[in-house]
């Protein structure tokens, strides 16, 4: 084993992984550590040095609130030097060479970049910098606990709605997955969207193995997620 790759938080059940402990383990055993922060970038502070992270991947369209189709990764030079580019092509630099440039970021950015998406992500990051990440996190966790409590108040024995994962906000992000036990989940998602304008994500969430571990395969779950602009009033509509 040379490399450990893990997500920072599950996009299915919301559990946040102990990045510090994993990083310490990797350093102790001489392992490279790559962290996928798709679900946490912009909402949970991450110290790459403290957690001994060699590469950190992120998407722009979730917690960073940028356009879809944007994302990137932060990578240490020692790891970058060991990786062959997945795609090669022109970069607009070192055009005299038949080889992809060895320097960053050009080595991993062939072709024409998604400039509109990058500018949109930049605008989103500028807006994000005006806010406190901790305040965003606490607001999202408040909504998460409020929603979980609301489900349990409606269905204490979970006979109709089963919450997947923890029922508190300890080591959690703002994702709540449920299973509808007496209604097709795709139909429930459709009605939430078409009747109430509530967008959810239904199915296996590109994470079939997570669903197998959680016992929700092959049906999957109906997932709700909350952001800094959401309110308790909106959650009340969903709960009703």
What would you call each of these model-derived segments?
Residues 1-240:
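Pyridoxal 5′-phosphate
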């Amino acid at each position: 084993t040379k490399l450990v790759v893990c997500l920072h938080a599950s996009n299915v059940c919301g559990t946040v992984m102990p990045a510090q402990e994993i990083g310490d383990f990797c350093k102790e055993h001489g392992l490279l550590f790559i962290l996928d922060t798709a679900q946490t970038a912009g909402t949970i502070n991450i110290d790459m040095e403290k957690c001994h992270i060699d590469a950190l991947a992120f998407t722009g369209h979730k917690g960073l609130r940028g356009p879809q189709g944007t994302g990137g990764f932060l990578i240490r030079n020692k790891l970058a030097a060991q990786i062959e580019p997945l795609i090669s092509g022109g970069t607009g630099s070192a055009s005299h060479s038949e080889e992809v440039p060895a320097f960053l970021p050009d080595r991993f950015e062939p072709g024409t970049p998604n400039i509109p998406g990058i500018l949109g992500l930049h605008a989103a990051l500028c807006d994000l910098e005006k806010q406190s990440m901790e305040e965003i996190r606490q607001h999202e966790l408040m909504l998460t606990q409020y929603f979980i409590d609301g489900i349990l108040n409606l269905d204490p024995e979970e006979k109709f709605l089963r919450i997947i994962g923890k029922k508190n906000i300890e080591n959690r992000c703002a994702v709540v997955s449920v299973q509808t036990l007496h209604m097709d989940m795709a139909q429930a998602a459709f009605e939430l969207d078409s009747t109430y304008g509530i967008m959810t994500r239904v199915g296996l969430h590109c994470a079939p193995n997570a669903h197998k571990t959680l016992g929700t395969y092959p049906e999957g779950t109906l997932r709700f997620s909350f952001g800094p602009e959401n309110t308790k009033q909106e959650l009340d509509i969903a709960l009703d």
